[in-house]
Amino acid sequence: MAIEILRLGHRGERDKRISTHVALTSRALGAEKIIFTEDDKHVKESVERIVESWGGEFKFEVVKSWRTYTRRFKDNGIVVHLTMYGENINKIMTEIREDISKTNKNLLLIIGAEKVPREAYDLADYNLSVGNQPHSEVAALAIFLDRLTEGKTLYSEYDDAKIKVTPSKSEKCVFVEKD
């Protein structure tokens, strides 16, 4: 199963920091690609620097129409929309994992930066809430991906990484490859 993240409504200068965090969280917790509906050189360069240093295969893509992309994806994939108005994650997560496992389909996860168009709710196979109180989309994304992978991606490492961290009780243990 490949996981892709579709970021709706990125607002340039206003959202560059949070959108960068969305991308980094996506990568760190197992996604293979993040898709934006507007190009942002700052976010793209930040993602590319992280991939260069920390390794792995994570792609940044821009699409003209999120609707077209989602419809095409849905033909052979499962679409989950994270929204505080959706079904309770505690009640629906097992069903989502089973659906993915049974069908062997890829996953497109939709998260919004601003008000999400009604059509996103209609296109989604699942509208899922991670709590029903206001919070960051980064928090919702992290919780969802961790639950989806059952914690298996928390300590991912990549063979091509130039920087690696070893968990330690009392000190920083960082390996940095010299050029």
Curated annotation (Swiss-Prot):
Its GO CC terms? cytoplasm
> Where found?
Cytoplasm
Q: Report residues binding S-adenosyl-L-methionine.
A: 82, 112-116, 130-137
Q: Which GO terms describe its molecular function?
A: tRNA (cytidine(56)-2'-O)-methyltransferase activity
InterPro entries tied to this protein? Alpha/beta_knot_MTases, tRNA_m1G_MTases_N, tRNA_mtfrase_aTrm56
Listed under catalytic activity are: cytidine(56) in tRNA + S-adenosyl-L-methionine = 2'-O-methylcytidine(56) in tRNA + S-adenosyl-L-homocysteine + H(+)
Q: Which UniProt keywords apply?
A: Cytoplasm, Methyltransferase, S-adenosyl-L-methionine, Transferase, tRNA processing
Q: Which SUPFAM superfamilies match?
A: alpha/beta knot (SSF75217)
Q: Does the keyword S-adenosyl-L-methionine apply?
A: yes
Task: Give the record's subunit note.
Answer: Homodimer.
Q: Which family does it belong to?
A: Belongs to the aTrm56 family.
Q: What does this protein do?
A: Specifically catalyzes the AdoMet-dependent 2'-O-ribose methylation of cytidine at position 56 in tRNAs.
State the protein's name: tRNA (cytidine(56)-2'-O)-methyltransferase
